[in-house]
């Protein structure tokens, strides 16, 4: 049995960048001291650069039963080795959880961090006044060349401008545990 060192996100890269993965891990085998720099370089080349080139971000929000929600898409505002921010424009409806009507010209900034257990959505008026924040609690976020993916844990935290944060939908999380969709430990 042979054990070989791997770079971070090995299985993800196997599906999206197998040649780059193979080259990086060959280098790692010869130079284990370069692991951190290899991790950073491959992440930059295979995840962040394609996102920056495209300029668009797609957020895949998967429900615990396996059913994906309609992907949220927006324009990339910024990215760094830890994550990214993208902007969405709204025109109608109500803000999820905040129960506030959407006005024309309102926009949202979504902050995504690789490996984070939450995704932060901040909503603003067209005049840049904060409406509120919506924190989606989820499995650790995985970044891809097109955007991000995570499993929604159904419980969220909302915070209207000037108010304290509030936990919502806790009963959905309890039901998921009771039905065996997610573990009690999770």
Task: List each language-model region with its residue ranges.
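Phosphate/ribose-recognition catalytic cores of enzymes acting on nucleotide-derived substrates
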Residues: 98-143, 148, 154-155
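Short acidic-glycine loop/turn motifs at beta-strand connectors
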Residues: 79-81, 125-128, 159-164
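Beta-strand scaffold of nucleotide-dependent catalytic cores
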Residues: 86-87, 133-135, 156, 168
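A hydrophobic, small-residue-rich beta->alpha segment in the mid-to-C-terminal subdomain
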Residues: 151-186
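Charge-rich, low-complexity N-terminal segments
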Residues: 5-105
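Short, solvent-exposed aromatic-acidic interface loops
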Residues: 91-93, 139, 171-175
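Mixed-charge, low-complexity intrinsically disordered regions
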Residues: 1-2
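Short helix/loop capping segments that flank catalytic or ligand/cofactor-binding pockets
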Residues: 67, 96, 144-145, 168, ...
């Amino acid at each position: 049995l042979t054990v070989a060192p791997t770079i971070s996100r090995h299985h993800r890269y196997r599906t999206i960048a197998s040649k780059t993965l193979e080259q990086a891990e060959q280098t790692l085998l010869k130079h284990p001291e370069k692991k951190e720099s290899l991790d950073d370089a491959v992440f930059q080349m295979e995840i962040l650069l394609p996102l920056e080139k495209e300029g668009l971000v797609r957020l895949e929000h998967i429900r615990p039963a396996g059913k994906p929600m309609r992907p949220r898409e927006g324009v990339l505002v910024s990215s760094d080795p830890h994550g990214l921010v993208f902007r969405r424009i709204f025109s109608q409806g109500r803000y999820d959880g905040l129960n506030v009507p959407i006005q024309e010209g309102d926009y949202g900034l979504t902050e995504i961090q690789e490996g984070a257990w939450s995704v932060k959505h901040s909503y603003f008026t067209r005049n840049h006044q904060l409406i509120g924040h919506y924190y989606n609690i989820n499995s650790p976020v995985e970044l891809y060349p097109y955007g991000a993916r995570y499993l929604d844990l159904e419980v969220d935290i909302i915070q209207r401008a000037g108010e304290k944060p509030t936990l919502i939908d806790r009963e959905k999380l309890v039901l998921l545990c009771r039905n065996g969709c997610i573990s009690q430990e999770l």
